Amino acid sequence: MDDFIRFAISEGFTSYGISSHAPLPFSTAWTMEWDRMEDYLSEFSRLKKKYAGKIELAIGLEIDYLNEENNPSLPCFQKLPLDYRIGSVHMLYSPEGKIVDIDTPADLFRQLVDRHFDGDLDSVVHLYYKNLLRMVELGGFDIVGHADKMHYNASCYRPGLLDEAWYDTLVRDYFAVIAARGYMAVSY
């Protein structure tokens, strides 16, 4: 964290937010484990004191919506002393109940859709936006992350998808809901 903060200061930032990926009910290479949470929060607190007066710092977590049992609205995430929470959908359940990571490069996304969803891109897109909408209904976060992730991968899978009326309607309806709720969408 220290290196990121020093770089932000050197580039003239006046404020900077740090957000790790929140723990999941299973281990991944890219998410924090619960037993590291206290270290994450205390290291941030130390750095906030160290850089006080030089840069305004905020700490957050990017929290995955998987289902009703794992999402940003859960008390275990709400009780954490965070400045902000990002709600995201990185994974979907396949029809067989297997968790499939869809936050992948486009070529791997194609393989995963073909293998786990029988190549039915439309159902994957609908499931993704259904999960995003459910996450928004449940709340518990300040920022929507990766709102365009499906947009990119699905259009690589099927060029021209972005021009299809049903897709445009789905995306517009989704953004209308997050705007009505006062959320900000961040893509990175």
Residue ranges and their predicted role:
Residues 1-2, 68-72, 122-128:
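Glycine-rich anion/phosphate-binding loops
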Residues 1-67, 77, 151-169, 173-174, ...:
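An N-terminally biased module of ancient metal coordination in phosphate/nucleic-acid-related enzymes
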Residues 75-76, 136:
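Short, well-structured alpha-helical segments in soluble
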Residues 81, 87-188:
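Domain-core and long-helix interface of multi-subunit machines
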